[in-house]
Amino acid sequence: MSKPYFIPPIDEEPRMPGSEAELDPPPQWEPRYKGSERLKDKVAIVTGGDSGIGRAVAALFAREGADIAIVYLGGEEDADAAETKAFVENEGRKAITIAGDLGDVDFAKSVVAQTIDAFGKLDVLVSVAGEQHPDTDLGDITPEQLLRTFQSNIHSMFYLTQAALPHLKEGAAIINTTSITAYAGEKELLDYSSTKGAIVAFTRSLSAQLAPKKIRVNGVAPGPIWTPLNPFGGSTPEKLATFGADTPMGRPGQPNEVAPSYLFLACGDSSYMSGQVLHPNGGMIVNG
């Protein structure tokens, strides 16, 4: 390969994240309360902003006064991205959609360049996009799948953050998405869980590096959340049948129950927090 970037064959794995419009019941992603301008006139990049948690974050940030660059894979997800963009604009804010694969370093650079061209600045970087492929046996994880999962979940985070840093100033916030699997493990998601552990370490280490610049870096570790990721190939049918039932609350979470964690970490309410991870996971205790 001329560069460390792997494009999987079309028929190798289900395409992710899939269309949110096809989910039954539909996820709850719209903000549940009025905004209070906690992100007034800020500019945010939100990856995975077409659907799921990313869509809920983009919608809530817009309600709180931010303009949004919605980054997503493209293709089947175009309609979802357009709906997210329309919501942002209906909130009186500006939005652009940028489609492509963040595992490609050149695309990651392009995302930041397009955001700066459109809005002139960048205040908040939110990385949500990722993928997972269930395997019950370690031996079933191919080298291609391993590379692809790390490329989508953690390499992309390095690339996008590297591109964004020259534009982030004092008071900026970086928010990374890890997972409960980084703390509790998941026997059918060995490669995915490994990337999420790497994200925790990346978040803590980058926080230490950027603290002198007064740029905060935190993370969110969701539990089972009802998004397209699991129904569109990210979970086995057996797991999907009882998705979220093993949490103390006995149900999966909704995207708009997770988005406020990102808002808290993006705004001044969390001005004395960096290197931390919030755990919207239905009451599971992970001591992380």
Outline where the language-model segments fall:
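A glycine/serine/threonine-rich, flexible loop-to-helix segment
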Residues: E188, P212, P224-T247, N287-G288
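Residue(s) in the substrate-gating loop at a strand-loop-helix junction
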Residues: S179
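Active-site helix of classical SDR
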Residues: T161, T195, T203
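Catalytic Tyr-X3-Lys loop
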Residues: D123, G139-F158, I175, I199, ...
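Conserved mid-core segment of classical short-chain dehydrogenase/reductases
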Residues: K3, I7-P8, K34, D104, ...
